[in-house]
Amino acid sequence: MSHHDGENEGTSADSGYDDFVILLDDDGNHIGTAPRATVHSQHTPRHLAFSCHVLDVGGRVLVTRRALTKVAWPGVWTNTCCGHPRVGETIIDAAVRRTHQELGLDLDPRRMRVVLPDFSYRATDSGGIVEDEFCPVVVARLSLPEELVELNPDPDEVEEVAWVGWQDMYDLARSMPALLSPWAVEQMLEFGPDLPVVR
């Protein structure tokens, strides 16, 4: 997704593995799959996703502005990366894969942690597209300062990137939530103003 609509999530090399999202019941049990390209609509079923927040060595968070061509929430600022795990793929592995695809950034799984394992949300964008996701949240910690982090954003996914202080991101979610994606707002409010601990 994405985020989250994920319409551009596959590539020619791996789209055969990336064409489906995992459908869930109200208790979070897997109940099947559905084509990723068609699952997001005004009647989106509950499905599995993830969100990732990448921090530099000083604790600044990488935020992205969704591409203007995205089906849902185009041009909206959000967390670093979101996506849909493949069948059999862990949340961490999915976050590594999508962050590389969307931003050209290689994350170290040893420096990542699922910090909000039970996060879920439902939201409707201005065009009527619904998101309904069980969406564990990952935080990844880099060993470099932001100025040494090399990024290569995919223009089909990402319009702009910025590094912001964690407190600033939290304050933005509290005071001007309309500037951010609804999932990023809810996640930041659950996190609170203090940096999550990642080894």
UniProtKB/Swiss-Prot annotation:
<protein>
    <recommendedName>
        <fullName>Isopentenyl-diphosphate Delta-isomerase</fullName>
        <ecNumber>5.3.3.2</ecNumber>
    </recommendedName>
</protein>
<feature type="binding site">
    <location>
        <position position="82"/>
    </location>
    <ligand>
        <name>Mg(2+)</name>
    </ligand>
</feature>
<keyword id="KW-0413">Isomerase</keyword>
<dbReference type="InterPro" id="IPR056375">
    <property type="entry name" value="Idi_bact"/>
</dbReference>
<feature type="binding site">
    <location>
        <position position="47"/>
    </location>
    <ligand>
        <name>Mn(2+)</name>
    </ligand>
</feature>
<dbReference type="Pfam" id="PF00293">
    <property type="entry name" value="NUDIX"/>
</dbReference>
<dbReference type="GO" id="GO:0046872">
    <property type="term" value="F:metal ion binding"/>
</dbReference>
<comment type="similarity">
    <text>Belongs to the IPP isomerase type 1 family.</text>
</comment>
<dbReference type="GO" id="GO:0004452">
    <property type="term" value="F:isopentenyl-diphosphate delta-isomerase activity"/>
</dbReference>
<dbReference type="GO" id="GO:0008299">
    <property type="term" value="P:isoprenoid biosynthetic process"/>
</dbReference>
<comment type="pathway">
    <text>Isoprenoid biosynthesis; dimethylallyl diphosphate biosynthesis; dimethylallyl diphosphate from isopentenyl diphosphate: step 1/1.</text>
</comment>
<feature type="domain" description="Nudix hydrolase">
    <location>
        <begin position="45"/>
        <end position="186"/>
    </location>
</feature>
<keyword id="KW-0460">Magnesium</keyword>
<feature type="binding site">
    <location>
        <position position="102"/>
    </location>
    <ligand>
        <name>Mg(2+)</name>
    </ligand>
</feature>
<feature type="active site">
    <location>
        <position position="82"/>
    </location>
</feature>
<dbReference type="InterPro" id="IPR000086">
    <property type="entry name" value="NUDIX_hydrolase_dom"/>
</dbReference>
<feature type="binding site">
    <location>
        <position position="131"/>
    </location>
    <ligand>
        <name>Mn(2+)</name>
    </ligand>
</feature>
<dbReference type="GO" id="GO:0005737">
    <property type="term" value="C:cytoplasm"/>
</dbReference>
<keyword id="KW-0479">Metal-binding</keyword>
<dbReference type="GO" id="GO:0050992">
    <property type="term" value="P:dimethylallyl diphosphate biosynthetic process"/>
</dbReference>
<feature type="active site">
    <location>
        <position position="133"/>
    </location>
</feature>
<dbReference type="InterPro" id="IPR011876">
    <property type="entry name" value="IsopentenylPP_isomerase_typ1"/>
</dbReference>
<dbReference type="InterPro" id="IPR015797">
    <property type="entry name" value="NUDIX_hydrolase-like_dom_sf"/>
</dbReference>
<feature type="binding site">
    <location>
        <position position="133"/>
    </location>
    <ligand>
        <name>Mn(2+)</name>
    </ligand>
</feature>
<keyword id="KW-0963">Cytoplasm</keyword>
<feature type="binding site">
    <location>
        <position position="40"/>
    </location>
    <ligand>
        <name>Mn(2+)</name>
    </ligand>
</feature>
<feature type="binding site">
    <location>
        <position position="84"/>
    </location>
    <ligand>
        <name>Mn(2+)</name>
    </ligand>
</feature>
<keyword id="KW-0414">Isoprene biosynthesis</keyword>
<comment type="function">
    <text>Catalyzes the 1,3-allylic rearrangement of the homoallylic substrate isopentenyl (IPP) to its highly electrophilic allylic isomer, dimethylallyl diphosphate (DMAPP).</text>
</comment>
<keyword id="KW-0464">Manganese</keyword>
